[in-house]
């Protein structure tokens, strides 16, 4: 089965944004509105073949997008040419995560989200459990101004690590990572190389 034949979770755009009454551009972090959109996704999500979903802007694919923080630093990575998503090669990114799959027996969308998020982090990174302090929801990301963004909605969270914690990338031929201070991420030479979602995140990071 090819990557595009994978069954992933989607939700109709009309439901997610209540026929555009909840639409936003960029990062949205107002709790009540975020909760409302998440409830809309929970009520309407279903499975779809990934190849079809990628070409159909009538549906939004919810994507966990986890930023790894350590004090005033964020873990930044570059997608190398050996990686999968050709539309994002040589871009810098702060977010880990990916398409969500249905979880049999999950009690809620929150549980489906947590299990998919845990799996993605486990696949991509080596982080000691005792170094993890908390995972905090920061909001939602939407970017309807490019073809990739049109079919996705990001569920943004931050994984806080203890001072001195180490992060190891597992897929070294696909991504190269390093720690960087938030102030450095805001400088043009780095900021302009970030994928759009990561630029949105930097804009709200202190």
UniProtKB/Swiss-Prot annotation:
Gene disruption: observed consequences: Essential, at least the last 3 genes of the locus cannot be deleted; could be due to polar effects on downstream ymaB.
SUPFAM superfamilies the record matches: Nudix
Induction field: Part of the probable nrdI(ymaA)-nrdE-nrdF-ymaB operon. Expression is constitutive but low, dramatically induced by thymidine starvation which requires recA.
Superkingdom of the organism of origin: Bacteria
Gene3D superfamilies named among the record's database cross-references: Nucleoside Triphosphate Pyrophosphohydrolase
Ranges in a coiled coil: none
Name of the featured protein: Protein YmaB
């Amino acid at each position: 089965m090819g990557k595009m034949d994978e069954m992933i979770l989607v939700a109709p755009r009309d439901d997610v944004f209540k026929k555009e009454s909840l639409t936003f551009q960029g990062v949205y972090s107002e709790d009540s509105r975020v909760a409302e959109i998440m409830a809309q996704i929970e009520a309407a999500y279903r499975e779809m073949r990934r190849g079809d979903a990628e070409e159909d802007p009538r549906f939004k694919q919810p994507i966990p997008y986890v930023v790894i923080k350590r004090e005033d630093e964020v873990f930044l990575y570059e997608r190398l040419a050996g990686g999968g998503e050709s539309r994002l090669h040589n871009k810098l990114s702060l977010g880990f995560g990916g398409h969500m799959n249905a979880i049999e027996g999950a009690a809620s969308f929150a549980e489906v989200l947590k299990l998919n998020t845990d799996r993605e982090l486990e696949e991509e990174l080596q982080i000691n459990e005792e170094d993890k302090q908390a995972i905090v929801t920061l909001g939602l990301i939407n970017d309807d101004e490019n073809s990739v963004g049109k079919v996705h909605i990001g569920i943004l969270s931050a994984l806080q690590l203890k001072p001195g914690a180490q992060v190891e990338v597992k897929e070294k031929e696909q991504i190269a990572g390093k720690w960087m201070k938030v102030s450095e991420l805001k400088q043009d030479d780095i900021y302009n190389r970030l994928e759009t979602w990561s630029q949105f995140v930097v804009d709200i990071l202190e």
